[in-house]
Amino acid sequence: TCALPICFYQNHRLYVNSRDDNQLRGEEVDLSTLKSNCGNKTMDGDRILNPCGSVANSLFNDIYTLVSPMTLTLNESHIAWKYDLEKFKNPSNYGDPSYKWLYESYPDLIPKEKSEDSASASFNGGGVQNEHFIVWMRAAALPRFRKLYGRIERDIPAGTQLEFQVKANFFVNNMEKALVVTTTNWLGGRNLFLGWSYVGVGVFCLLFAIAFIVKQLTCPRKLGDVKY
């Protein structure tokens, strides 16, 4: 069990496996294979979901717009890993009405076509090539997680108040969601869990090393002695 607020286990085996990677690469996949991989998230009425699966069809689709100060811009491009960008392609029959496409399921967040705005998450393409979607499809390891939404690429003076307009499309029931503004460096964003994990493992290894040193000093092993 997980005490309130309810946690979102994006790495649950049934959830993370509910997808078809060949379909996400833009390949044609037969319906029986899609049903095997995506279960009840394969069809919407008599139309095939493209993409299918629980991960794609639970996309976080809140919209954040930086409205103040006017001198700052929220850049939503280049937020996905370069390796991930290469794994998502729209198929040759993109737009076929026998399928229900991502831009129909999430019209506020996902456009159909590529954007000409270099700061847009759809600068590389619409549909499954939208970077917000690609970021979401990389499963988080922990039940409390963050997903990169955009970047402010200018220094912000201390004391500056940021005002965001939020369109809350993603329904939550006894869960928490938040907009976090943080500073990143070449190692990534602030992550207390990862830091304490490294400290814990380091202390554990240090204690073991001390124990082995004490053992070697008090009861040394003779070279070639089979008793040890």
Residue ranges and their predicted role:
Residues 2-4:
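Short, small-residue-biased leader/transition segments that mark boundaries at the very start
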Residues 8-12, 16-17, 21-30, 118-119, ...:
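Membrane-proximal loop-to-helix boundary features in eukaryotic membrane proteins
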